[in-house]
């Protein structure tokens, strides 16, 4: 049995807290990513991993030592690192004659590989080569995907989902306008994926809404899709399954229209409208003569009944 697969009993309170953090939760922690370079990674691949790590901070772990592994042939080492560092996302960089400047991006489910997609780097401009101001660490990016392939082709559709998982950052309930600081733009065109990073500049516009300008921040990559190893539809659905406790409870007799208006249905007993007290107006009051005639009529009806 593997050392990491054993049931570990904590001996101290600190170890107990550490293991409790890794236990399954209804609302999971922010997904961390590990960035690993292969045994033959060159300077380009190493710099790409460093730049992606700079964008992912503090939700990333950069492995500085080279690791000889092949993600498509054997995933045991990746699963070992995933369990050891509690990371559900990974990026692996390598370089060889057959596949130069190679990036493998993937994600885990229950510490087992779910999806792996291989990308080739054709052009790269580093974060440090673009001499502009950068965003502070931990800034949540805006993600933009352009191109029909992201919605049509299954490989590109799964790649889009994987990139959203990789760069989305923490889930927040509210966002202030000044917190929108940079954009990650992915374009799928003619079999290539163009990855660009821009800083958002809010300029004065003379009204309440500011004028927006984009300034390239880096890194910039031209990628091409190579190999893929995708999870089956059943396993993918299982990984997306939401716990029952988080599912919103259905409310009976409530419906919504296209404009978001809420309609409710109330069940009541039949009301006797003859006893309903209505508002009396002076103009509708009966005159004494009319009242006297009505009383006499009622009296005659009672006598006839008797």
From Swiss-Prot:
User: Basic and acidic residues composition bias: which ranges?
Assistant: 290-300
Q: Name one GO molecular function term.
A: 5S rRNA binding
Q: Does the keyword Nucleus apply?
A: yes
SS bonds (residue pairs): none
Q: Which residues form the Brix domain?
A: 31-234
Name the InterPro entries on file: Brix, Rpf2
Q: Which domain of life is it from?
A: Eukaryota
* Entry keywords, A to Z: Nucleus, Ribosome biogenesis
GO BP terms:
maturation of LSU-rRNA from tricistronic rRNA transcript (SSU-rRNA, 5.8S rRNA, LSU-rRNA); protein localization to nucleolus; regulation of signal transduction by p53 class mediator; ribosomal large subunit assembly; ribosomal large subunit biogenesis
Q: Which GO terms describe its cellular component?
A: nucleolus
Disordered as annotated region, ranges: 268-306
Signal peptide, first to last residue: none
Q: Which segments show compositional bias classed as Basic residues?
A: 277-289
What is the annotated localization of this protein?
Nucleus, Nucleolus
Q: Which family does it belong to?
A: Belongs to the RPF2 family.
Protein function: Involved in ribosomal large subunit assembly. May regulate the localization of the 5S RNP/5S ribonucleoprotein particle to the nucleolus.
Q: Quaternary arrangement and interactors, per the entry? A: Component of a hexameric 5S RNP precursor complex, composed of 5S RNA, RRS1, RPF2/BXDC1, RPL5, RPL11 and HEATR3; this complex acts as a precursor for ribosome assembly.
The protein's name in its UniProt record: Ribosome production factor 2 homolog
